[in-house]
Amino acid sequence: MNTVRVTFLLVFVLAVSLGQADKDENRMEMQEKTEQGESYLDFAENLLLQKLEELEAKLLEEDSEESRNSRQKRCIGEGVPCDENDPRCCSGLVCLKPTLHGIWYKSYYCYKK
């Protein structure tokens, strides 16, 4: 019974001492990995930042090229009443007095050219 206790005690002491050494090694290994991971994250962050800056530059370039006055304002679709003095018909449509079916409305409508 004594030999079993001594053997168990010896195995226990060896396990604890080797375990602590492994723990220190693991701690150092984890520290190295986190340092490598941080450098990788920094690299990835810089790469992403460069891509975002390029995208932003392209968007701003397109914005400056496009004039706000060149955009079509809200327009009236086909078959919708319009004002003969201020026609706002969409492109490809003209503000005309209706023929036949709409003459009793006494109004102008947007029709295709």
Swiss-Prot record:
Residues 1-21 form the signal peptide. One of its GO terms (cellular component) is extracellular region. Expressed by the venom gland. Coiled coil: none annotated. Its main location: secreted. GO terms for molecular function: sodium channel inhibitor activity; toxin activity. Keywords: Disulfide bond, Ion channel impairing toxin, Knottin, Secreted, Signal, Toxin. Disulfide bonds join 75-90, 82-95, 89-110. Residues 22-74 form a propeptide. It holds the Pfam family Toxin_22. It is found in: Secreted. The keyword Nucleotide-binding does not apply. Probable ion channel inhibitor. The presence of a 'disulfide through disulfide knot' structurally defines this protein as a knottin. Belongs to the neurotoxin 14 (magi-1) family. 01 (HNTX-16) subfamily. This is U11-theraphotoxin-Hhn1a.
